[in-house]
């Protein structure tokens, strides 16, 4: 849209006329300058305004131009206003500087057809240009690796919805296991997609985490998040699940019981520890305050291998290990005393006994546990069995006094006789864990009645930090804490 054309008549307003004169006078001189330079000609411009004031312009020297003008006697073109107006009206060159006829400005049927064709081609080009960017996304596919957790993933809410992780829910869209295949031999707790599918836990008692709270896919199936061990790597996670009526027992070291399994296990030696434990299933412990999870600790990844070996549907009261043997080989049946004796272990591969009813029916993939249990391996089978091809001094009697043993991994073991389970008691608040504790040491049974009786005072003889991991293919890949089996054939 061009500028509005004014009517070429005398301007009546004095002020407007003066402004228009100043602007157009300069424009005229500018055009004269351009013409003189472009066409190599001499121009002399003489202007008298309405008050007889002189304004002149000369491309070179006014006197020379005027002298040449006066001495010129040849026929030449001379025009006045009437000539210009007549030329403009006749040739319909309105607004054109030159009165000469120019066929390019005349719209003939041929030129109109040519312009229409140009416009159509331009419209087609613009239409194709707009559609082209939209085509590649329609046929484009890219594998995306979504981190399992984010620094803001560990948010603790009421006991009914224990852990809420937006990144975990976001990873549910990645069903292809090839997108989520992590490295196997790293020391990060990356779990390969070979982990079998585990249906959610069934029981929920006393306001514990139910199966509808959070379900995380691990490439081949889903498992509920229970005891708060969240894998912060970009891989499908093998999370130790603790149901409402299940165990949160931790094997590594003896220590005073955390309040109903509702405290955080913070190891000051492991600044990258992140552990959150659900409150007691019996309703005796109020939910954790979110202030208990400091930002510096909540944003750190796990640095300790954690395996949660789950048991099928344990009752909320009574002997907590009663249903344990049903998930494993009957050749290695375990009693509650045997399992209780496992508490004295100090080993790099911790064993957290949780509960999810589906693990008794599926394989624990060897590849899925190599990167979780540092140096520890669970042989694959329909029932969880133990590879006993090395000399591990792990024989224990439930009623024997405490005695020191040395495992192949160099960690000192202590056995503790287990008293009969006392009645459930209200948990007591506990300060931060001591330095020598392992990252998963703060786990306790969510619904167990061993809350206050199966742990000793904080240990001072934990003289070795938790080993992050050994090569999965080494000779010493079996961790003594993978399973404490009652086998009299194993000599001490």
From Swiss-Prot:
One GO term of the biological process aspect: positive regulation of gene expression
UniProt keyword terms in alphabetical order: Acetylation, Activator, Apoptosis, Developmental protein, Differentiation, DNA-binding, Isopeptide bond, Neurogenesis, Nucleus, Phosphoprotein, Transcription, Transcription regulation, Ubl conjugation
Modified residues (N6-acetyllysine): 249, 395
Chain positions covered by the region annotation Required for interaction with MAPKs: 266-283
DNA-binding feature ranges: 58-86
Biased composition (Pro residues): 417-430
Site positions per UniProt: Cleavage: 176-177, 213-214, 451-452
GO cellular component: chromatin; cytosol; nucleoplasm; nucleus; transcription regulator complex
PROSITE patterns per record: MADS_BOX_1, MADS_BOX_2
Subunit structure comment from the entry: Binds DNA as a homo- or heterodimer. Dimerizes with MEF2D. Interacts with HDAC7. Interacts with PIAS1; the interaction enhances sumoylation. Interacts with HDAC4, HDAC9 and SLC2A4RG. Interacts (via the N-terminal) with MAPK7; the interaction results in the phosphorylation and transcriptional activity of MEF2A.
Protein name per the record: Myocyte-specific enhancer factor 2A
């Amino acid at each position: 849209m061009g500028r509005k054309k004014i009517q070429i008549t005398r301007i009546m307003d004095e002020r407007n006329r003066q402004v228009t004169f100043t602007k157009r006078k300069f424009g005229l001189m500018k055009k004269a300058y351009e013409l003189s330079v472009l066409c190599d000609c001499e121009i002399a411009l003489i202007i008298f305004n309405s008050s007889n004031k002189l304004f002149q312009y000369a491309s070179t020297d006014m006197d020379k131009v005027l002298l040449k003008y006066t001495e010129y006697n040849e026929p030449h073109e001379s025009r006045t206003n009437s000539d210009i107006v007549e030329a403009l009206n006749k040739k319909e060159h309105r607004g054109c500087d030159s009165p000469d006829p120019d066929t390019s400005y005349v719209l003939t049927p041929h030129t109109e057809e040519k312009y229409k064709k140009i416009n159509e081609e331009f419209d087609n080009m613009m239409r194709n240009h707009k559609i082209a960017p939209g085509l590649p996304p329609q046929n484009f596919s890219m594998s995306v690796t979504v981190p399992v957790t984010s620094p803001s993933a560990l948010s603790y809410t009421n006991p009914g919805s224990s852990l809420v992780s937006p990144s975990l829910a976001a990873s549910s869209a990645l069903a292809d296991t090839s997108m989520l295949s992590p490295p196997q031999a790293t020391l990060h707790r990356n779990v390969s997609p070979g982990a079998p599918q585990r249906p959610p836990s069934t029981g929920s008692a006393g306001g514990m985490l139910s199966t509808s709270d959070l379900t995380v896919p691990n490439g081949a199936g889903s498992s509920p998040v229970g005891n708060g061990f969240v894998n912060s790597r970009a891989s499908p996670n093998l999370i130790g699940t603790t149901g409402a009526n299940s165990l949160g027992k931790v094997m590594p070291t003896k220590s005073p019981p955390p309040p109903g399994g509702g405290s955080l296990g913070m190891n000051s030696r492991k600044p990258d520890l992140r552990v959150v434990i659900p409150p007691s299933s019996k309703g005796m412990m109020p939910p954790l305050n979110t202030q208990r999870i400091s930002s510096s600790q909540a944003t750190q990844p796990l640095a300790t291998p954690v395996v949660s070996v789950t048991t099928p549907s344990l009752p909320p009261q009574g002997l907590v290990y009663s249903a344990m043997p049903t998930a494993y080989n009957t050749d290695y049946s375990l009693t509650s005393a045997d399992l209780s004796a496992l508490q004295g272990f100090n080993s790099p591969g911790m064993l957290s006994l949780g509960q999810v009813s589906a693990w008794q029916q599926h394989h624990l993939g060897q590849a899925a546990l190599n990167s979780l249990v540092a140096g520890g391996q669970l042989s694959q089978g329909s029932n969880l069995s133990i590879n006993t091809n090395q000399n591990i001094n792990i024989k224990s009697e439930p009623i024997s006094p405490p005695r020191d043993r040395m495992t192949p991994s160099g960690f000192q073991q202590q056995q503790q006789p287990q008293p009969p389970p006392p009645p459930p008691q209200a948990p007591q608040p506990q300060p931060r864990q001591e330095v020598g504790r392992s990252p998963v040491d703060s786990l306790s049974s969510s619904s167990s009645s061993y809350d206050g009786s199966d742990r000793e005072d904080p240990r001072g003889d934990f003289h070795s930090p938790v080993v992050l991991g050994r090569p999965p293919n080494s000779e010493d890949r079996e961790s003594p804490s993978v399973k404490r089996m009652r086998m009299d054939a194993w000599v001490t």
